Amino acid sequence: MTTTEADHPSASGQASAASPAAGASPEPVDENIWLEDIYGQEQLAWVREQNARTEELLEDADYAELEDRILEVLDSTDRIPMVGKHGEWYYNFWKDRANPRGLWRRTGWDSYRAGAPEWDVLLDVDALAAAEGQDWVFHGANFLRPAPGEPHRLALLAFSPDGGDANRYREFDVEARGFVDPADGGFDLPTGKGNASWLDGDTLLVATTAEDLPRTTSSYARTGVKLRRGESLTQAERIFDIPEDHMMAIVAHDSTPGFERTFAVDWISFFEKNTSVLRDGEWVQIDVPADVNLSSHRDWLLFRPQRDWTVNGTTHPAGSLLAAGFEDYLAGGRDLAVLFTPDPHTSLQSWSWTRDFLLLNLLRDVSSEIHVLDPRRPGTDSAWAATVLDACP
């Protein structure tokens, strides 16, 4: 939040506070509240001073050598380029010593499998930053799902001007190899904290603090809007709001054919949130404790409780993974399939879906295991048939 001179201590370090009303408890004085203005010159000078103190204490004769060794690993061309598939292309974002801000690029499957891919560079972020005089940090791409048979062409690219939480979202045409001009209706959202998601080819769902839209006391987006081409954020239809003292709002659309759903999330705090799905123009909150993490995929709703969760007399321990039919659960059904239960030796690190299978990344006695679960077949140790993927190193 922005502060004024009256909000932070004077040069002597003393802060003033209004006298409390009779009988009222005095308001606590936060002597560091002035640092909330993170772009203020006085605040940045203070940060530089603290950095200098730290460097003086930590930088010894071995520091430069250690830094060079770390950078050699981070900049190594032997790293595996991680990719994401969109249509027939495999996309990668690559940073190294020559490209510190990164290259957004793509290649074909045969080229990628050959071991020395021929990369088609779509965007050089270093060149963009130099051309626009802004220290852009690339925060990812969100593709519009095209009509069947059409290529993935349009994407929202997120750029932070300083590496922080606030992003500017700009529409990019990968076939034209450039940003879609706002004068021609291209989306170009001003920098703000929040998120943006495609609803359709001409509409975005946006939660943001830009253009003075409401924000929470945590300085994140409080409102979700439906933004159509040609509209400003202030003209957009408001579709979701949360209390000011909650952390942040998110709105997003799942465009999976046959399973299209629009979601809104009220992040109450860092560890608690309520998730709602849009039904017939109304938000329907999914009935789970606020500390149960939710995710959906096609027919399924997955649950990851952060604390023990008792449902229909059965207690599921924290760290479990459970599943239910999406529509059945919304209709009141509470028949949960147990997909994973932690034990003293095993924890669930992450999971991901293919079209038909669920992959669990387990850590057993500090060794990774990948389990492939099939929702179509009953299992023995879990509700769904599971096999261990033994082809992983």
Region annotations inferred by a language model:
Residues 1-29:
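Charged, compositionally biased N-terminal leader segments and the immediate start
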Residues 27-61, 67-89, 93-110, 115-121, ...:
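Peripheral, non-catalytic segments that deliver or gate enzyme domains
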